[in-house]
Amino acid sequence: MATSETRVLFLSLCLILGKVVLSQFDELWLVGDDDPLNALQTRRERREERCDYSVGKWTFDETYPLYDSSCPYLSSALSCQRNGRPDSYYQKWRWIPKACSLPRFDALKFLGKMRGKRIMLVGDSMMRNQWESLVCLVQSVLPTHRKKLTYNGPTMSFHSLDFETSIEFCWAPLLVELKRGVDRKRVLHLDSIEDNARYWRGVDVLVFDSAHWWTHSQRWSSWDYYMDGNKIFKAMDPMVAYERGLTTWAKWVEINLDPSKTKVIFRTVSPRESGQMCYNQKHPLPSLSSSTKPHVPQQSRVLNKVLRTMKYRVYLYDITTMSAYRRDGHPSVFKRAMHEEEKHHRIAGPSSDCSHWCLPGVPDIWNEMLSSIILTNAV
């Protein structure tokens, strides 16, 4: 009797285990993967996809940075070492996510994954900051005569000729169109996007950001009027305008892009400090108090609201809070080269840059995250 019951139990367990294994491989078969080793990797990648890279801590690492300020593609305003910044600790921090691993940037792996493809970073000067970082991370593994830079309208593109890969930047800080109207007045068209979006077609990976320009004060605003449909507005709640602009972008993505051909990522806002808050900072903040948390909750809520309405899968790529710890990473007064006398009498003033980031620096870690997202097929 005992033997009979044991056999029944054994057969039941076999059936259960068989169903589990089959269900796992059925799932993998749906994505067209017949190789069991690749199948296991696919499962690991899907688990990795659920990891939140934005939660973690900064750890000092002497092996960083991954390139130096001699990178020929760096803007002078971001080359803090060239501009005389005396400390270099800000270059030596890596981000350790709490619940998953974040590998060091591997230029050959990234280029191998992007072989024959285009990646375009679309947005404002903070996205240009990230583009320069990404180009510097990959260019050192390429022979000098096998890479080049080209320009087309608001875009600039770095090309790896051997990998047939292009890493592109498109200047579109508001995503929607900003045009001159009657009497040369600047009009922000909340429902028009094609003038910018025509450059996004045919790209394999699109990475967007848009936030800072929407909240510029009246003095620094880039437009005189808003236009939505046939209506013109002198004033509008910035977050209402932001939502309408993002909705126009979302509609364009869903109508014009094919999710099987183009992966879309939206990067959250890069935190910025006001006044002298980043001057003479040499280490990451140990914690974020209520007064040091980035002031971007409205933009985050609006962005999430719009993304939730979309059928097109968009990967939300969160760098805001992790970057808020890094006041030490901004150029501050080292956004330009200084004379010897200035170096000895440095003072923080209105000209301090507490928005952009020194390179090498924080955007390199953003690109480690971006590379991991792409390499693990998380998007």
Swiss-Prot record:
Membrane-topology annotation of the record: Single-pass type II membrane protein
Assigned keywords, A-Z: Membrane, Signal-anchor, Transmembrane, Transmembrane helix
Gene Ontology MF terms: O-acetyltransferase activity
Cross-referenced Pfam families: PC-Esterase, PMR5N
Record flagged with keyword DNA repair: no
GO CC annotations on file: membrane
DCXHWCLPGXXDXWN motif, short sequence motif: residues: 353-367
Motif (GDS motif): 123-125
Residue intervals passing through the bilayer: 8-24
InterPro entries referenced in this protein's UniProt entry, alphabetically: TBL (IPR029962), TBL_C (IPR026057), TBL_N (IPR025846)
Keyword RNA-binding: no
Coiled-coil intervals, chain numbering: none
Subcellular location: Membrane
Additional comment: Contains 2 motifs that are conserved in esterases, but it is unlikely that this protein belongs to the catalytically active pectin esterases.
Function: May act as a bridging protein that binds pectin and other cell wall polysaccharides. Probably involved in maintaining esterification of pectins. May be involved in the specific O-acetylation of cell wall polymers.
Family statement: Belongs to the PC-esterase family. TBL subfamily.
PANTHER family: PROTEIN TRICHOME BIREFRINGENCE-LIKE 36, PROTEIN TRICHOME BIREFRINGENCE-LIKE 9-RELATED
Protein name (record): Protein trichome birefringence-like 36
Organism, as annotated: Arabidopsis thaliana
Lineage: Eukaryota, Viridiplantae, Streptophyta, Embryophyta, Tracheophyta
